[in-house]
């Protein structure tokens, strides 16, 4: 079983490192194009997106793995049970994301004033970011389904598609001189939006014509399991990204410029975060599918030991 975990970690890991490294090449690219204050807008927005994604996915990713395993344990028509689970979790997250976007788009002017002077002249930034979040949430459960099915290569291929498209568009916009126009940094969000939308359209081909449809009885059970995960996820995400907001609101002068510098420097820690990410992508469905096996405790202990050893080596 540990061999399977190691294999999936390697698949997720090599591809994740390559894709994320390509994505992080945008950091020196953007810092050469934009001034410190302008790049501060990028840092600010991309610190808020993970919080919105955590809130709107509601812990349903992990719940999907858990209840998929329960469907297999229960026997019967496992395929129908998993299809019902997928339709329910996908449906509720899609609905939540749609409502979120409508609210954000409707109140974009008020939100732009709340976020600071840098956004007042460009409330459209809020709309573009809302659309990015919408498409990313709509893609979330289909991606979880691929992980649950062990289709690691397809998973990383689709993730790579989005990142590569984002990078290519960003470079193309820069070469075309669009970042120097009045819309400026907004083209960063447009590139991301196009990449997220294309990824969502492509991943739709993997859902086997399943229509998002909420089974309310099943949702109650799933949400009871996911609620603690949601709370923990929000706490973890806030802990990881709240420092950006503290800089934005507590630095007396030049806060956005300082935020831009800080955001660029924190990219240095990317290697450790990449290793954590690649292990989590493989470990989460693996453990939630095997936790009832007799040797699970020993297997978990061994996996954690090697994870800590590898983490110390990277450090």
How should these model regions be labeled?
Residues 1-5, 181, 185-188, 201-240, ...:
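Interhelical loop/hinge segments that connect adjacent transmembrane helices in multipass membrane
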Residues 1-24, 80-83, 87, 153, ...:
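N-terminal membrane topogenesis motif
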Residues 4-65, 97, 101-105, 132, ...:
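Signature of the first transmembrane helix
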Residues 6-19, 83-84, 126-131, 145-171, ...:
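Alpha-helical transmembrane segments of multi-pass membrane transporters/permeases
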Residues 17, 87-115, 168-172, 276, ...:
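Alpha-helical transmembrane segments of multi-pass membrane transport and lipid-handling proteins
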Residues 51, 102, 117-139, 190, ...:
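Alpha-helical transmembrane segments of multi-pass membrane proteins
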Residues 70-89, 261-315:
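Specific pore-lining/lateral-gate transmembrane helices of multi-pass inner-membrane transport
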Residues 127, 156-208, 232, 266-269:
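Hydrophobic alpha-helical transmembrane segments
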């Amino acid at each position: 079983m540990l061999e399977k975990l190691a294999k999936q970690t390697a698949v997720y890991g090599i591809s994740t490192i390559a894709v994320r490294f390509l994505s992080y090449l945008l950091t020196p690219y953007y810092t050469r194009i934009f001034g410190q204050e302008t790049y501060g807008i990028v840092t600010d927005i991309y610190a808020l997106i993970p919080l919105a994604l955590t809130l709107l996915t509601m812990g349903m990713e992990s719940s999907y793995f858990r209840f998929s395993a329960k469907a297999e344990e229960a026997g019967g028509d496992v395929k129908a049970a998993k299809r019902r689970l997928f339709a329910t979790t996908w449906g509720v997250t899609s609905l939540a994301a749609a409502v979120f976007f409508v609210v954000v788009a409707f109140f974009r002017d008020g939100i732009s004033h709340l976020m600071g002077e840098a956004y007042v002249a460009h409330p459209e930034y809020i709309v573009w970011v809302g659309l990015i979040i919408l498409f990313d949430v709509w893609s979330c459960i289909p991606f979880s389904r691929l992980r649950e099915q062990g289709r690691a290569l397809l998973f990383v291929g689709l993730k790579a598609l989005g990142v590569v498209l984002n990078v290519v568009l960003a470079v193309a916009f820069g070469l075309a001189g669009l970042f120097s126009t009045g819309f400026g940094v907004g083209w960063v969000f447009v590139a991301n939006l196009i990449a997220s939308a294309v990824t969502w359209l492509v991943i739709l081909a993997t859902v086997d014509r399943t229509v998002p449809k909420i089974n309310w009885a099943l949702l109650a059970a799933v949400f009871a399991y996911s609620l603690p995960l949601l709370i923990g996820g929000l706490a973890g995400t806030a802990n990881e990204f709240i420092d950006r907001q503290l800089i934005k609101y507590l630095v007396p002068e030049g806060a956005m410029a300082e935020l831009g510098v800080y955001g660029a420097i924190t990219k240095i820690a990317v290697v450790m975060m990449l290793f954590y990410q690649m292990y989590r992508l493989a470990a989460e469905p693996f453990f939630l599918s095997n936790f009832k096996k007799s040797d699970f405790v020993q297997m978990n202990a061994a996996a954690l030991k090697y994870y800590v050893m590898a983490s110390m080596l990277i450090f």
